[in-house]
Amino acid sequence: MAAIEPNPNGKKVIVGMSGGVDSSVSAYLLMQQGYQVEGLFMKNWEEDDTDEYCAAAEDLKDAQAVCDKLGIKLHTVNFAAEYWDNVFEYFLAEYKAGRTPNPDIMCNKEIKFKAFLEFADDILDADYIAMGHYVRRSDASGQSQMLRGVDGNKDQSYFLYTLSHEQIARSLFPVGELEKSEVREIAKEMGLVTHDKKDSTGICFIGERKFTDFLRTFLPAQPGKIETAEGEVIGEHQGLMYHTLGQRKGLGIGGMKNSNDDPWYVVDKDLERNVLVVGQGGKHPRLMSVGFYADQLHWVDRTGPNDGAKITVKTRYRQQDVACTLTYEGDDRIKVIFDEPVAAVTPGQSAVFYDGEVCLGGGIIDSLIRE
């Protein structure tokens, strides 16, 4: 693997040790390259003491075992207050407003590359921080850019679009140069306890709990009607916030007379009437949009693409890039028109833009353009 920096000797890197395989191997690779490496474990959520399985305690144990094996120091820090104020409150407010937020993106913005970086700077005297994210950093243009990870299936640039070039310049991403299978192989060869630990999925503060049960403890749900796009009432929902555009499972409808066998999808949410609108088929006209408006913009280079730029966009993680044209509607609002209509574009989610391998930045989808 190419060295991340020509002369890493003596430079101090604080690695965000999560107790997973990616951060474990990141620490090892940086040591191999001659960096002075220390780990930092973040606790971002205060679990209920009644939780049968305390994930954070298990993760800390694994992080400590890896650091012991590598012979490096592990620090710990509690960011639960910062997480609550900057990530969780936002998450609840968005759901309350009928949108579908992405807390992982907000966590990267406010915690992993802000609170963590400040702590590493002020308390641990770091030259760099490092994370186990599958992205790459390039300094070829004279300014740090973020590129997609080599492993297209694990690329996490979508979740990191809020980073500025200054933050990227202070960050190292060793596993971004590797395939996931290679990362597990390295961990196995090194005898790291995390080599076969399964990847964490879902939202960290929900853990193993059912999403609807978790949300119900914080937000009062208001049941209402489920209607077809033609206005026929065909069922009841337990709360609009439990549903997202394009959702197919968990609607509790089916076997309708006079309907074909195509599955039902959520095609709209009528907030004023508290009605969930459904239609049949993944390409239902109400599910399709030709574009969208977005705001809360973040550009990695702080200026963004040119007005009228022809680039590509992802409107959700793991989606294939879609060719589009971007135009500005003021300082903090853009209009995006797809080359081809796209299904299930969802307000509250992030739209992330690319020029080839380079992640340019993105914004929050505000409203859809249907035709």
Curated annotation (Swiss-Prot):
> What GO cellular component is one of the record's annotations?
cytoplasm
Q: What does this protein do?
A: Catalyzes the 2-thiolation of uridine at the wobble position (U34) of tRNA, leading to the formation of s(2)U34.
* NCBIfam families in UniProt: PRK00143.1, trmU
Please list the GO terms describing molecular function.
ATP binding; tRNA binding; tRNA-uridine 2-sulfurtransferase activity
A matching Pfam family = tRNA_Me_trans_M
**Residues the record marks as active site:** C107 (nucleophile), C204 (cysteine persulfide intermediate)
Q: Where is this site: Interaction with tRNA?
A: H133, Q349
Task: Report the SS bond pairs.
Answer: C107-C204
**Native source species:** Shewanella loihica (strain ATCC BAA-1088 / PV-4)
Keyword Cytoplasm appears in the UniProt entry:
yes
Which compartments does it reside in?
Cytoplasm
Family named by the database record: Belongs to the MnmA/TRMU family.
For the biological process aspect of GO, one term held by this record is: tRNA wobble position uridine thiolation
Name of this chain's protein: tRNA-specific 2-thiouridylase MnmA
Report the EC number(s), separated by commas if there are several.
2.8.1.13
Region annotation Interaction with tRNA: where it falls in the sequence: 154-156, 316-317
**Record-listed ATP binding positions:** G16, M17, S18, G19, G20, V21, D22, S23, M42, G132
